[in-house]
């Protein structure tokens, strides 16, 4: 959190400098861990965030962290992931969810549909679009997951393509961006733009 104040000052300066050219939003991506959420959010609430993006890369179990992107075949971990995101959304602080389909569930398709439909329903209820993630597409990860996109389409969710650039060069990866747009178009989606 020591860099948060500098980050906010930088974004606020850039907002003023480029206000005639582009709209710049103040945003932060974070994970949700119940045991440390309150002190973390108290720090963040001091700043005028436009977007607070939930991106759950890990879950905490048996006193250790486990990556959500690594293959999980059991119902318990899938349920834990969806419940963790739902609990995070219950806080009312998050207005975006990054790669909600990051959970690499390799088990029964019916269970996947059961739990991920609950997540899609909640995102729809909160008016949070499902992200089609460019970084996952570029890296060949398990997301964006066509099963989840299809489920969201059938559920009537809105969608957005999120760049998720981890360095400035990735922002200019038009081939991966166009691949995600094509995926959306293949499902008959019209994307929202922020």
Residue ranges and their predicted role:
Residues 157-172:
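Short acidic/histidine-rich active-site segments
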Residues 1-76, 172:
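A metal-dependent hydrolase metal-coordination microenvironment
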Residues 31-37, 105-110, 137-144, 168-176:
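Acidic-and-aromatic substrate-binding clefts and catalytic sites of carbohydrate-active enzymes
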Residues 26, 96, 159-161:
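Residue-level marker for buried hydrophobic side chains located in beta-strands
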Residues 18-20, 125-126, 155, 187:
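Helix C-cap/helix->beta junction micro-motif
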Residues 53-155:
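Domain-core and long-helix interface of multi-subunit machines
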């Amino acid at each position: 959190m020591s860099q948060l104040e500098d980050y906010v000052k930088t974004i606020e300066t850039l907002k003023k400098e480029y206000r005639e050219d582009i709209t710049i939003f103040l945003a932060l991506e974070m994970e949700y861990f119940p045991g440390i959420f309150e002190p973390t959010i108290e720090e963040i609430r001091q700043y005028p965030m436009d977007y607070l993006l939930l991106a759950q890369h890990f879950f905490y179990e048996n006193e250790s962290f486990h990556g959500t992107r690594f293959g999980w075949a059991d119902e318990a971990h899938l349920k834990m992931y969806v419940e963790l995101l739902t609990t995070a959304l219950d806080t009312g602080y998050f207005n975006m969810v990054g790669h909600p389909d990051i959970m690499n569930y390799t088990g029964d398709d019916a269970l996947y549909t059961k739990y991920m439909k609950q997540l899609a329903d909640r995102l729809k209820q909160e008016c949070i679009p499902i992200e089609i993630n460019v970084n996952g597409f570029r890296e060949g990860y398990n997301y964006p997951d066509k099963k989840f996109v299809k489920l969201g389409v059938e559920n009537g969710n809105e969608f957005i393509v999120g760049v998720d650039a981890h360095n400035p060069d990735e922002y200019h990866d038009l081939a991966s961006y166009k691949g995600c747009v094509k995926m959306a178009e293949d499902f008959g989606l019209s994307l929202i733009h922020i």
